[in-house]
Every structure is written in C-alpha cells, then in structure tokens.
Design a protein with these regions (language model features):
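Charged, amphipathic alpha-helical segments and their flanking helix caps
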Residues: 1-38, 51-148
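Low-complexity, acidic Ser/Thr/Pro/Gly-rich terminal tails and inter-domain linkers that flank the onset
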Residues: 42-52
Length: 148
C-alpha cells in the first residue's frame, strides 16, 4: 500500500489566499491579498507570512499532517479607532467564514482559524530600512488537517 500524497502546503497557501479574497469580496472590502510577503504595503493588506507544519507517522502507510498558515493583515499606520473597528469587524467575520468553509484547504482536508493576535507595532523586517514603517496589524493562524 502506498501513502496517499497531498501537496498540502501548496493547497494550504492557495486556500488561505482564496478564503481571504472570497471573504473580502463578500463583504465588499478592498483588501490587497498576497500569497507571500509583498514588496510594499498599502493597507488594508493581507499576506501569507509563514507556513509551519507538524507531521505524525502512525504506520508505514498512514500519517497525519497539520500545517499552520500564518496570515498577517495590516490595517494602517497606527492603532486608530477606525483601524480598530475595521480590524474587529474583519476578524469576527473572517473567523466565521473559515468555520463555514472548513474544506478551504482542499478536498479531504479541514481548516480552522485557531489563533488571532494583534500586532500593534508591526514592522515588516524584509523591507529596506528607508521603507520600513510601523503598522497596526493582526496575525491570523489557520490550521489545516489531513490524514493520508
């Protein structure tokens, strides 16, 4: 028996981007979405910052994969009341969107929003020093599951 193969990290990244775009479109939010860190940020902007994964081998033919996609959503240059309201409405609605679209990482997989964390002094460390700004952002962790 051969282990079923799923390009799960590929599907997880694509699924996160698709869910962000679909939710933003459903709520008429002008959100720039990137599948990796962008060259520049013009809020509101969302992007996949990192993917981490744990894998458990149960037998030669069975394993479990749990990738966690870390998404950063940048709201603005400072924590204003308007940016905070935008953040609250988005993360509440997006968490429900993910729950309703639990196969968002692909067939025979599950996804859930497992963590939300405000980043009130977020500085994109990959940008040149001359372009670095301090932003108000939120990190959303989307955890997938597949048993193959």
């Amino acid at each position: 028996m051969v282990l079923a193969r799923i390009p799960f990290q590929t599907q997880a990244r694509a699924g996160a981007v698709t869910m962000l775009n679909a939710y933003a479109a459903s709520e008429n939010i002008k959100l720039q979405v990137y599948r990796a860190r962008p060259r520049s940020i013009n809020p509101p902007t969302a992007f996949v910052d990192a993917i981490n994964e744990t894998m458990t081998e149960f037998t030669i033919t069975m394993r479990q994969r749990i990738p966690t996609v870390e998404v950063i959503i940048v709201w603005g240059l400072f924590d204003s009341g308007e940016a905070a309201d935008q953040r609250d409405a988005f993360v509440d609605g997006f968490a429900d969107w993910v729950a309703d679209n639990f196969h968002g990482f692909g067939t025979n997989t599950l996804v859930a929003s497992v963590s939300l964390q405000d980043l009130p002094s977020y500085i994109p460390d990959w940008m040149p020093d001359s372009e670095k700004k301090t932003y108000y952002a939120t990190q959303v962790s989307l955890e997938g599951f597949a048993a193959t």
